[in-house]
């Protein structure tokens, strides 16, 4: 009994030390400031990124209608409230890019690359990565994300459409299972995306257990924030009263900021789990790993 009590007390102290270290680490890394910076970059790069992704999808006959399906799915499940307004605006913006020249198209591609590059830099900063990737390797990785990413998404959409068309779904039991699968699909996709982000982006080895736990926390926070944000927008429509038809702009900015805040918090959790030697309730708790060289200069 004494052993059990001692073990529980030890684990509670360890958890408290981790939580204190995590808060100090996030404050040190200015997570809230970096989330705002990434939100700003995302809003500037959103249309270029969508244009590049949809143009890649449209080049394959198999994925001819995948673009619209992806837009509907993302808006419905990942952008709470004001979804139709945001969708209409994005479709208009993307449609206007069809009138651009080759130089304009190149600019869109560069803007999309810049977004991925900034995500890469911020996450590597959280993991205190000292050695940067070579430029050729980084560009190859960004290119792979922009090309293979849409193809994989399009393939999954095509597979889902094929499964939906099967007659076996007329069975009531199978139909219930399929509906349950669709209900949990957004959470599963978010979780898998966070795991991949925390495992693959940092230029150092990340333990998969840490990445899975950090991704789980981020995915749960993301789902809770979706419901909470949607409830706030519908119950307290102050943005609509103040901004009127332009209400979608601040709503979208706040939502993108929340998304990046959650991504960075999950990254901080994942990185902190690998720094157990710093979990201490002493004054040395803030002994962080050294900053990247470019941050020292």
UniProtKB/Swiss-Prot annotation:
Main location: membrane
Annotated membrane topology: Multi-pass membrane protein
Subcellular location: Cell inner membrane
Cellular component terms (Gene Ontology): plasma membrane
Pfam families noted in UniProt: Virul_fac_BrkB
Superkingdom of this protein's organism: Bacteria
Keywords on record: Cell inner membrane, Cell membrane, Membrane, Transmembrane, Transmembrane helix
Membrane-spanning residues: 43-63, 100-120, 135-155, 181-201, 213-233, 245-265
PANTHER family, sorted: INNER MEMBRANE PROTEIN YHJD (PTHR30213), UPF0761 MEMBRANE PROTEIN YIHY (PTHR30213:SF0)
Family: Belongs to the UPF0761 family.
HAMAP family xref list: UPF0761
Protein name: UPF0761 membrane protein VC_2742
Source organism (scientific name): Vibrio cholerae serotype O1 (strain ATCC 39315 / El Tor Inaba N16961)
């Amino acid at each position: 009994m004494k052993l059990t009590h001692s073990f529980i007390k030890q684990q509670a102290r360890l958890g408290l030390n981790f939580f204190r270290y995590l808060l100090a680490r996030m404050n040190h890394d200015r997570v809230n400031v970096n989330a705002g910076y990434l939100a700003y970059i995302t809003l500037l790069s959103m249309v270029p990124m969508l244009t590049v992704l949809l143009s890649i999808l449209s080049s394959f006959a198999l994925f001819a209608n995948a673009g619209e399906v992806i837009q509907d799915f993302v808006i419905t499940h990942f952008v709470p409230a004001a979804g139709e307004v945001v969708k209409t605006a994005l479709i208009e913006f993307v449609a206007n890019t069809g009138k651009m020249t080759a130089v304009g198209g190149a600019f869109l591609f560069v803007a999309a690359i810049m977004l991925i590059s900034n995500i890469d830099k911020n996450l590597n900063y959280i993991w205190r990565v000292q050695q940067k990737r070579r430029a050729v390797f980084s560009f190859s990785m960004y290119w792979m994300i922009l090309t293979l990413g849409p193809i994989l998404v399009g393939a999954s959409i095509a597979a889902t459409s094929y499964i939906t068309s099967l007659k076996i779904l007329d069975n009531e039991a199978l139909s219930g299972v399929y509906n349950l699968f669709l209900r949990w699909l957004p959470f599963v996709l978010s979780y898998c995306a966070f795991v991949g982000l925390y495992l693959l982006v940092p230029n150092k080895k990340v333990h998969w257990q840490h990445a899975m736990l950090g991704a789980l926390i981020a995915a749960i926070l993301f789902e809770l924030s979706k419901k909470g944000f949607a409830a706030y927008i519908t119950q307290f429509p102050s943005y609509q009263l103040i901004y009127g038809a332009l209400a979608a702009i601040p709503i979208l900015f706040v939502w993108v900021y929340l998304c990046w805040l959650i991504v960075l918090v999950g990254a901080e959790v994942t990185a902190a789990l690998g720094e157990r030697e710093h979990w201490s309730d002493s004054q040395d708790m803030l002994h962080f790993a050294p900053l990247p060289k470019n941050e020292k200069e």
